[in-house]
Amino acid sequence: SCGKATTRMEVKIDSPDPQNVAGEIICKGANLMLGYYKNAEATSQIIDVNGWLHTGDLATMDTEGYVTVRGRSKNMLLTASGQNIYPEEIESKLNNMPYVSESLIVLQNDKLVALIYPDFDDAFAHGMEQSDIEKVMEDNRNELNLQLPAYCQITKVKIHFEEFEKTAKKSIKRFMYQEVKG
Protein backbone atom coordinates (compact mmCIF):
# COMPACT_ATOMS: atom_id res chain seq x y z
CA SER A 1 0.00 0.00 0.00
CA CYS A 2 1.16 3.53 -0.65
CA GLY A 3 -1.17 4.93 2.00
CA LYS A 4 -4.33 6.99 2.18
CA ALA A 5 -5.31 10.22 0.49
CA THR A 6 -4.50 13.45 2.27
CA THR A 7 -7.22 15.51 3.87
CA ARG A 8 -9.00 17.97 1.57
CA MET A 9 -8.72 15.48 -1.29
CA GLU A 10 -11.17 12.91 -2.58
CA VAL A 11 -9.70 9.76 -4.12
CA LYS A 12 -11.62 7.02 -5.90
CA ILE A 13 -10.72 3.96 -7.91
CA ASP A 14 -12.61 3.89 -11.21
CA SER A 15 -13.55 0.22 -10.99
CA PRO A 16 -16.75 -1.78 -10.44
CA ASP A 17 -14.98 -3.54 -7.53
CA PRO A 18 -12.19 -1.25 -6.24
CA GLN A 19 -11.11 -3.71 -3.52
CA ASN A 20 -10.42 -6.54 -5.95
CA VAL A 21 -10.26 -5.16 -9.49
CA ALA A 22 -7.71 -2.46 -10.27
CA GLY A 23 -9.01 0.72 -11.81
CA GLU A 24 -7.67 4.17 -12.54
CA ILE A 25 -6.97 6.42 -9.57
CA ILE A 26 -9.04 9.58 -9.90
CA CYS A 27 -8.94 12.47 -7.47
CA LYS A 28 -10.57 15.79 -6.76
CA GLY A 29 -9.66 18.60 -4.41
CA ALA A 30 -8.68 22.24 -4.03
CA ASN A 31 -5.02 21.24 -3.82
CA LEU A 32 -4.90 19.71 -7.32
CA MET A 33 -3.89 21.44 -10.52
CA LEU A 34 -6.55 23.29 -12.46
CA GLY A 35 -5.15 22.19 -15.80
CA TYR A 36 -2.31 22.65 -18.22
CA TYR A 37 -1.30 26.25 -18.85
CA LYS A 38 -2.84 27.47 -22.13
CA ASN A 39 -3.62 23.90 -23.22
CA ALA A 40 -7.34 23.21 -22.90
CA GLU A 41 -7.13 20.07 -25.04
CA ALA A 42 -4.53 18.40 -22.80
CA THR A 43 -6.48 19.50 -19.72
CA SER A 44 -9.71 17.95 -21.03
CA GLN A 45 -7.90 14.64 -21.49
CA ILE A 46 -7.04 14.33 -17.79
CA ILE A 47 -9.69 16.37 -15.97
CA ASP A 48 -13.25 15.26 -16.68
CA VAL A 49 -16.41 17.41 -16.71
CA ASN A 50 -17.05 16.61 -13.03
CA GLY A 51 -13.61 17.87 -11.99
CA TRP A 52 -11.96 14.47 -11.44
CA LEU A 53 -8.26 14.28 -12.29
CA HIS A 54 -7.45 11.02 -14.09
CA THR A 55 -3.94 9.99 -13.04
CA GLY A 56 -3.32 7.08 -15.40
CA ASP A 57 -2.27 4.98 -12.39
CA LEU A 58 -4.08 1.70 -11.74
CA ALA A 59 -4.76 0.67 -8.17
CA THR A 60 -7.03 -1.07 -5.71
CA MET A 61 -8.33 0.45 -2.47
CA ASP A 62 -9.24 -1.42 0.69
CA THR A 63 -12.22 -0.68 2.94
CA GLU A 64 -10.10 1.66 5.10
CA GLY A 65 -9.04 3.78 2.11
CA TYR A 66 -5.52 2.43 1.68
CA VAL A 67 -4.44 2.53 -1.97
CA THR A 68 -2.20 -0.10 -3.56
CA VAL A 69 -0.78 0.98 -6.92
CA ARG A 70 -0.66 -1.86 -9.45
CA GLY A 71 0.82 -0.06 -12.45
CA ARG A 72 0.10 2.43 -15.21
CA SER A 73 -2.94 2.07 -17.45
CA LYS A 74 -0.80 2.55 -20.56
CA ASN A 75 1.51 -0.32 -19.45
CA MET A 76 -1.19 -2.88 -18.64
CA LEU A 77 -1.01 -6.03 -20.77
CA LEU A 78 -4.22 -7.78 -21.80
CA THR A 79 -4.01 -11.48 -22.60
CA ALA A 80 -6.19 -13.25 -25.18
CA SER A 81 -8.13 -14.80 -22.28
CA GLY A 82 -8.98 -11.31 -20.99
CA GLN A 83 -6.62 -11.27 -18.00
CA ASN A 84 -5.12 -7.91 -17.03
CA ILE A 85 -1.39 -8.15 -16.29
CA TYR A 86 0.41 -5.33 -14.49
CA PRO A 87 4.03 -5.76 -15.61
CA GLU A 88 5.46 -3.41 -12.97
CA GLU A 89 4.37 -5.80 -10.20
CA ILE A 90 6.21 -8.72 -11.82
CA GLU A 91 9.25 -6.60 -12.70
CA SER A 92 9.53 -5.37 -9.13
CA LYS A 93 9.86 -8.96 -7.89
CA LEU A 94 12.20 -9.97 -10.71
CA ASN A 95 14.49 -6.96 -10.19
CA ASN A 96 15.16 -8.17 -6.64
CA MET A 97 16.38 -11.59 -7.77
CA PRO A 98 20.04 -12.63 -8.10
CA TYR A 99 22.06 -10.93 -10.83
CA VAL A 100 19.11 -9.01 -12.31
CA SER A 101 19.97 -5.39 -13.03
CA GLU A 102 16.66 -4.50 -14.69
CA SER A 103 13.82 -6.27 -16.43
CA LEU A 104 10.86 -5.72 -18.68
CA ILE A 105 7.82 -7.97 -18.99
CA VAL A 106 6.34 -8.13 -22.49
CA LEU A 107 3.61 -10.11 -24.20
CA GLN A 108 4.78 -12.19 -27.18
CA ASN A 109 2.38 -14.53 -28.96
CA ASP A 110 0.06 -14.23 -25.92
CA LYS A 111 2.84 -15.47 -23.60
CA LEU A 112 4.62 -13.43 -20.95
CA VAL A 113 8.32 -13.07 -21.62
CA ALA A 114 10.89 -11.51 -19.29
CA LEU A 115 13.53 -9.40 -21.00
CA ILE A 116 16.37 -9.20 -18.49
CA TYR A 117 19.47 -7.06 -18.44
CA PRO A 118 21.68 -9.00 -16.02
CA ASP A 119 24.19 -7.43 -13.65
CA PHE A 120 27.07 -8.65 -15.80
CA ASP A 121 29.73 -6.92 -13.68
CA ASP A 122 28.61 -8.73 -10.53
CA ALA A 123 28.18 -12.05 -12.33
CA PHE A 124 31.61 -11.89 -13.97
CA ALA A 125 33.16 -10.78 -10.65
CA HIS A 126 31.81 -14.04 -9.21
CA GLY A 127 33.46 -16.05 -11.98
CA MET A 128 30.29 -16.69 -13.93
CA GLU A 129 30.21 -17.25 -17.67
CA GLN A 130 27.36 -16.58 -20.10
CA SER A 131 25.93 -20.10 -19.65
CA ASP A 132 25.96 -19.65 -15.84
CA ILE A 133 24.07 -16.37 -16.15
CA GLU A 134 21.47 -18.00 -18.40
CA LYS A 135 20.99 -20.79 -15.83
CA VAL A 136 20.58 -18.30 -12.97
CA MET A 137 17.99 -16.36 -14.99
CA GLU A 138 16.07 -19.57 -15.68
CA ASP A 139 16.23 -20.41 -11.95
CA ASN A 140 14.95 -16.89 -11.22
CA ARG A 141 12.06 -17.46 -13.64
CA ASN A 142 11.11 -20.71 -11.91
CA GLU A 143 11.33 -19.11 -8.46
CA LEU A 144 9.29 -16.10 -9.59
CA ASN A 145 6.58 -18.31 -11.11
CA LEU A 146 6.07 -19.95 -7.70
CA GLN A 147 5.01 -16.50 -6.44
CA LEU A 148 2.63 -15.68 -9.30
CA PRO A 149 -0.87 -16.81 -10.29
CA ALA A 150 -0.93 -19.11 -13.33
CA TYR A 151 -2.12 -16.38 -15.71
CA CYS A 152 0.89 -14.17 -14.77
CA GLN A 153 3.61 -16.77 -15.11
CA ILE A 154 6.66 -16.08 -17.25
CA THR A 155 7.10 -18.60 -20.06
CA LYS A 156 10.51 -17.50 -21.24
CA VAL A 157 13.52 -15.39 -20.30
CA LYS A 158 15.50 -13.47 -22.88
CA ILE A 159 18.84 -11.97 -21.93
CA HIS A 160 19.24 -8.35 -22.99
CA PHE A 161 22.91 -7.45 -23.47
CA GLU A 162 22.52 -3.68 -23.15
CA GLU A 163 20.68 -1.48 -20.68
CA PHE A 164 17.15 -0.71 -21.79
CA GLU A 165 16.67 2.68 -23.42
CA LYS A 166 15.33 5.23 -20.95
CA THR A 167 13.34 8.44 -20.97
CA ALA A 168 14.72 11.65 -19.45
CA LYS A 169 13.01 10.55 -16.19
CA LYS A 170 14.99 7.26 -16.30
CA SER A 171 11.91 5.15 -17.06
CA ILE A 172 12.36 2.33 -19.55
CA LYS A 173 10.94 3.16 -22.98
CA ARG A 174 8.54 0.20 -22.94
CA PHE A 175 7.13 0.88 -26.38
CA MET A 176 10.50 0.05 -27.93
CA TYR A 177 10.38 -3.52 -26.63
CA GLN A 178 6.72 -4.52 -26.87
CA GLU A 179 6.87 -5.93 -30.39
CA VAL A 180 9.99 -8.06 -29.95
CA LYS A 181 9.57 -11.21 -32.05
CA GLY A 182 10.84 -14.71 -31.41
Where do the protein language model's features map onto the residues?
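Conserved ATP-binding/catalytic segment of the ANL
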Residues: 17-20, 24-79
